[in-house]
Every structure is written in structure tokens, then in C-alpha cells.
UniProtKB/Swiss-Prot annotation:
Protein name per its UniProtKB record: Type II secretion system protein I
Phylogenetic placement of the source organism: Bacteria, Pseudomonadati, Pseudomonadota, Gammaproteobacteria, Enterobacterales
Assembly information from the UniProt record: Type II secretion is composed of four main components: the outer membrane complex, the inner membrane complex, the cytoplasmic secretion ATPase and the periplasm-spanning pseudopilus. Interacts with core component GspG. Interacts with pseudopilins GspJ and GspK.
Keywords tagged on the record: Cell inner membrane, Cell membrane, Membrane, Methylation, Transmembrane, Transmembrane helix
PTM statement from Swiss-Prot or TrEMBL: Cleaved by prepilin peptidase. Methylated by prepilin peptidase at the amino group of the N-terminal phenylalanine once the leader sequence is cleaved by prepilin peptidase.
Residue stretches in coiled coil: none
Residue intervals passing through the bilayer: 5-25
SUPFAM superfamilies: Pili subunits
Length: 123
């Protein structure tokens, strides 16, 4: 009596292994891709938070002017811009903050709105 596997059994086992290995590699590749996106969004959020903090230190008149600049963080150059918004309420001021890796803002990674009171603090 012969012991061992037939050629068909070996080929079937290799095909199953190849399919499962491909699936594992695709999952790992997707996880690495997601990690890069999450890292970009996190750092862009930090840049936006820094700009929000600076806006809180400005006067109401300074916040009412559109501003644009760049910041270096986590080994990359980030571009940010602030856009004042009309709220229809004299006691409330809103400013949109956008952050991008591109100077032309073709792809905005982080966008948020900051609200400021017109009473108290710096005017």
C-alpha cells in the first residue's frame, strides 16, 4: 500500500493556501493604508487646534480677516487658512479653519468651525 498524497491533492492544498495568503495580505495592506489616513487626519487636527488656540488669542477685528499660512508638524508642511463667517448675531463670531497638505487646498484633510463670543475676553 502506497502512502502519500496524489498530485491533485497537493495542487488543491496549494490553491487553498494561495487564496488564504492573498486574503491575509490584502487585509494587512488595507490596515496599513488606513493607518496612513488616520495619521494624516490626526496631525491635521493638531494643526487646526493650534490655529484655533491662536484665534482665541486674537481680537475680534483680527479674527474677522481671512488668514492663510503654513506650519511644519510631524515631518510635513501643512497649509491652513481661516475664513470668518457671518453669524447674523453681533454677539457671536464664527471662523472656519481648513488644513491641507497642498498649498492650493485641492484636498482639505481637516475642516472645523470655531465659535467666539463678542462679550468678555479680547475684543
Amino acid at each position: 500500500m502506497k502512502r502519500g498524497f496524489t498530485l491533485l491533492e497537493v495542487m488543491l492544498a496549494l490553491a487553498i493556501f494561495a487564496l488564504s495568503a492573498t486574503a491575509v495580505l490584502q487585509i494587512a495592506s488595507g490596515a496599513l493604508s488606513n493607518q496612513h489616513v488616520l495619521e494624516e487626519k490626526t496631525v491635521a487636527g493638531w494643526v487646526a487646534e493650534n490655529q484655533t488656540a491662536l484665534l482665541y488669542l486674537m481680537t475680534r477685528g483680527q479674527r474677522a480677516v481671512r488668514q492663510q499660512g503654513e506650519s511644519d508638524m510631524a515631518g510635513s508642511r501643512w497649509y491652513w487658512r481661516t475664513t470668518p463667517l457671518s453669524t447674523g448675531n453681533a454677539l457671536l463670531q464664527a471662523v472656519d479653519i481648513e488644513v491641507s497638505l497642498h498649498e492650493d487646498f485641492s484636498s482639505v484633510i481637516q475642516s472645523r468651525r470655531a465659535w467666539f463670543s463678542a462679550v468678555g475676553g479680547q475684543q
